[in-house]
Amino acid sequence: MMITLRKLPLAVAVAAGVMSAQAMAVDFHGYARSGIGWTGSGGEQQCFQTTGAQSKYRLGNECETYAELKLGQEVWKEGDKSFYFDTNVAYSVAQQNDWEATDPAFREANVQGKNLIEWLPGSTIWAGKRFYQRHDVHMIDFYYWDISGPGAGLENIDVGFGKLSLAATRSSEAGGSSSFASNNIYDYTNETANDVFDVRLAQMEINPGGTLELGVDYGRANLRDNYRLVDGASKDGWLFTAEHTQSVLKGFNKFVVQYATDSMTSQGKGLSQGSGVAFDNEKFAYNINNNGHMLRILDHGAISMGDNWDMMYVGMYQDINWDNDNGTKWWTVGIRPMYKWTPIMSTVMEIGYDNVESQRTGDKNNQYKITLAQQWQAGDSIWSRPAIRVFATYAKWDEKWGYDYNGDSKVNPNYGKAVPADFNGGSFGRGDSDEWTFGAQMEIWW
């Protein structure tokens, strides 16, 4: 008994050391932004986004606290074979109080197995919820190729002239299909699962410093037995993507062309939508009808222009043409130059313009937005974070159309459709006005 008791402190110390080593091996990554702002005409900070545009210029124009907290660990390794477990919990609140409760979103929980297939060295097998090979424009927070969700796949297969990746993911729509509930009345409360099958060929070196990535995504509604799609629903669709990435001026330029059909046009990023119905006030259902096509031409990048200047930029044209004439044409162009006073202090300006034309009315909405920010950041790159900035933003807009959400779909045939700003004596869109805001914000990724 004496020997056992003497060994106990040593056993505890060894166990603590092992647990400490394991704890230190956990990878902690994430993203967060938060701050405080005011509006020139009074009240809390307002943010500005053009009606019909799918994003906004974000510098000095974010009104929420948002965070993603990622924990992951390599849980097994033998030679070059390994298993990695990855998780991500995200949340967003209105940024108006000390205590703001919200339900977190469990966005990632997956396992990735590397080099598990002997005849496919360098490849990765994965399954679970995952941010899957996302492509975005940072300065407008716009994801143009993103099939994230629960799924499985095999990626980075070396085919000699590039890397091949195969994946299947899922998203769902509330009320997407129906069955008879009682008295021959359709019940729209069931969710419809939308599956996406993704094939990508990346890292093809086609010119000095330049690579090409090609992708095809097919999305379709996957109905339960004895269910039917609502009338006019879009059952499936395709998205084709070509992206050229060029190393230039210590940075990069990406040129992207995308074409989508039917259910892949609404979000335009690779997730299928359109098989479902939406609910206004949780009472009346209206169809999401997006049969048609989408064309997107996009150029964006980040470059260094000497020791003291960096710049982000974006230019995009997007045409969503729907059979029901409720599509849009969206042009956007913007720049974010940065002047570095010291390795940790800079002045940043962002200038952005959006123009959105309604297919149904032919009218246009436009907005100019400019932000000037003084910033302190952890490094001398435009990508350096964390950053603390104080900013002032001015926006001016003129909107000639908006979406009609008055009443409900049972009595309003225009519900959810684009209408002129003064339709039927009403007021749709944001009109013709301007505003300025100011505040402070932190942003970090790690």
Swiss-Prot record:
InterPro entries in the record: G_neg_Bact_CarbUptk_Porin, Maltoporin, Porin_LamB, Porin_LamB_sf
Inducers of expression: By maltose.
Main location (coarse class): membrane
Name of the protein in question: Maltoporin
Site label Important in sugar transport, positions: 143
Gene Ontology annotations of biological process type: monoatomic ion transport
Reactions accelerated catalytically: beta-maltose(in) = beta-maltose(out)
Gene3D superfamilies found in the cross-reference section: Porin, LamB type
Source organism of this protein record: Shigella sonnei (strain Ss046)
Regions crossing the membrane: none
Function per UniProt: Involved in the transport of maltose and maltodextrins.
Subunit structure: Homotrimer formed of three 18-stranded antiparallel beta-barrels, containing three independent channels.
Coiled coil: none
Membrane topology: Multi-pass membrane protein
Family stated for the protein in its record: Belongs to the porin LamB (TC 1.B.3) family.
Molecular function GO terms recorded: maltodextrin transmembrane transporter activity; maltose transporting porin activity
Record site: Greasy slide, important in sugar transport: 31, 66, 99, 252, 383, 445
Alphabetical list of HAMAP family matching this protein: LamB (MF_01301)
Location(s) in or outside the cell: Cell outer membrane
Keyword line: Cell outer membrane, Ion transport, Membrane, Porin, Signal, Sugar transport, Transmembrane, Transmembrane beta strand, Transport
Signal peptide segment: 1-25
UniProt GO cellular component terms: cell outer membrane; pore complex
